[in-house]
């Protein structure tokens, strides 16, 4: 396994692992970079790529994902964050917009998510979870108490 982080003008990281046995070999690798744009109070932008390869006997399954994130403080209390994740194999995108407000003893989070609908997956319905959570468009509110 490799876990490397460099904090310079641009932040860079790599997390990689190889898991090998008699019948299988799993390779996981993630590389990413981040930078704070000198706009307003600073806009943090981040990009990350992850690849997973799983070989079992003569079969191989590969998954690839890319994620982008932008985060911006709005004063001392509020923060706006956008995250977009792309499944490169299935051509799906998952998008999240979060407005958070942090106070001394609690925080409030409003999250809008836009994800593929159940019908967008090439998977039989009986293999999909029974819950609708994570499918389509959703709005979530979280109250977090910090004690």
Language-model features, listed with the residues they occupy:
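A generic beta-sheet turn/junction motif
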Residues: 7-8, 90, 101-105, 147
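Outer-membrane beta-barrel "beta-signal"
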Residues: 99-101, 110-112, 133-147
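Solvent-exposed loop segments that connect transmembrane elements
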Residues: 119-132
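Generic detector of contiguous secondary-structure segments
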Residues: 22, 29, 91-100
């Amino acid at each position: 396994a490799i876990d490397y982080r460099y904090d310079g003008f641009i932040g860079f990281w790599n997390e990689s692992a190889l898991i090998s046995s008699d019948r299988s070999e799993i390779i996981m690798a993630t590389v990413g970079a981040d930078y704070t744009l000198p706009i307003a109070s600073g806009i943090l932008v981040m990009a990350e790529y992850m690849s997973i390869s799983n070989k079992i006997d003569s079969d191989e399954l590969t998954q690839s994902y890319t994620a982008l994130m932008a985060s911006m403080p709005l004063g001392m209390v509020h923060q706006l964050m956008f995250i977009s994740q792309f499944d490169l194999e299935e051509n799906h995108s998952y998008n999240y917009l979060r407005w958070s407000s942090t106070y001394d003893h609690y925080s409030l989070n409003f999250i809008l998510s836009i994800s593929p609908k159940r019908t967008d997956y090439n998977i039989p319905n009986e293999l999909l979870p029974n819950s609708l959570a994570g499918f389509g468009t959703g709005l979530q509110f979280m109250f977090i108490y910090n004690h």
